[in-house]
A protein has these predicted regions:
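Outer-membrane beta-barrel biogenesis signature
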Residues: 18-51, 55-57, 148, 158-163
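Residue-level signature of outer-membrane beta-barrel architecture
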Residues: 26-27, 38-40, 71, 107-109, ...
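Transmembrane beta-barrel architecture of outer-membrane proteins
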Residues: 31, 62-64, 98-104, 143-145, ...
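Transmembrane beta-barrel strands of outer-membrane/channel proteins
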Residues: 36-40, 81-85, 119-125, 163-173, ...
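Outer-membrane beta-barrel channels and translocator barrels
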Residues: 41, 74-78, 86, 110-114, ...
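Extracellular loop and loop/strand-boundary signature of outer-membrane beta-barrel proteins
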Residues: 52-55, 88-93, 132-137, 172-175, ...
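Outer-membrane beta-barrel "beta-signal"
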Residues: 102-105, 222-227, 234, 246-258
């Protein structure tokens, strides 16, 4: 593998640790990656139907412990699985249970030493937890998602872009049963600092159909590579939305490559 190709593979691992799910770069044939993540989001305000901040009746807490796993069926086809266990409470509910379980496949539509484009299709089965951030626990039955991802790395930098930097954009359509359908747009930028450190800046946005909930969250994390292991620590904040909590909290990820 070329130096640029190896850099892209490392970027792929980091992107896949995000709540966006599938990334532009697939796993090589026979390679496996397992990611564990923990999030604890709290909010005492939310965004009303007009998108204006408003106090909640009581603090809302959502705690999630999740797993994401992927396996390279071929160099261009990757099988993926993700699921989580949730607990939370607000003024109206106090719950604990399984979140949605999702299985999908990513196909590498095109790739060279700097750029990758992929298409993803997946199926999710709802659980007792929140199957959407704006939904009541247990609401929603099953989902189908299609997602297109495009990423580009800059090994030597380019203009104001520092060396060993990458950008990725993902656009998705999620067809839901028991909840409104959604469109999603996620953007990631990352840059390497030395051999073992990386800084990531990410934005996760989406909107439910029929004038429903809308959200935009930003996240900044620092990643440390430890051989075949990596540790990611950071903070996520909801900065805009409609009918969604203004949540914030820590994000911790641990993954292992085989």
């Amino acid at each position: 593998m070329s130096r640029a190709g190896g850099l892209l593979a490392g970027f792929a691992a980091l992107v896949l640790a995000s709540p966006a799910g599938a990334g532009a770069w697939t796993q090589p044939r026979g390679k496996t990656q397992v990611i564990l993540k923990y999030e604890e989001m709290r909010a005492d305000r939310g965004f009303d139907p007009d998108g204006l901040p408003a106090d909640l009746p009581a603090e809302r807490r959502d705690t999630t412990a999740g797993v994401f796993a992927e396996y390279g069926l071929t160099d261009r086809l990757t099988l993926q699985f993700k699921g989580d266990w949730q607990s939370g409470e607000d003024a109206f509910v106090d719950f604990e249970g399984r979140g949605p379980i999702e299985v999908g496949v990513t196909w590498q539509a095109w790739r060279d030493d700097q750029t990758a484009v992929s298409l993803y299709a997946g199926y999710a089965r709802g659980g007792e937890g929140r199957n959407a951030g704006y939904a009541l626990p247990g609401q929603g039955e099953q989902d189908w998602e299609v997602r297109a991802s495009a990423g580009r790395s800059f090994e030597a930098g380019w203009g104001p872009i520092p060396p060993r930097t990458f950008f990725e954009v993902q656009a998705a359509r999620r067809m839901r049963e028991g909840l409104p359908d959604e469109v999603r747009l996620d953007v990631t930028a990352g840059t390497r600092l030395g051999a073992d450190w990386m800084v990531l800046a990410q934005a996760f946005g989406g909107q439910a159909d029929d004038g429903g909930a809308r959200w935009l969250s930003v996240e900044t994390t620092v990643v440390r590579d430890l051989g075949d292991w990596s540790v990611q620590v950071g903070w996520r904040q909801t900065v805009a939305g409609r009918e969604t909590p203004e949540a914030s909290g820590p994000v911790v990820g641990l993954w292992r490559r085989f």
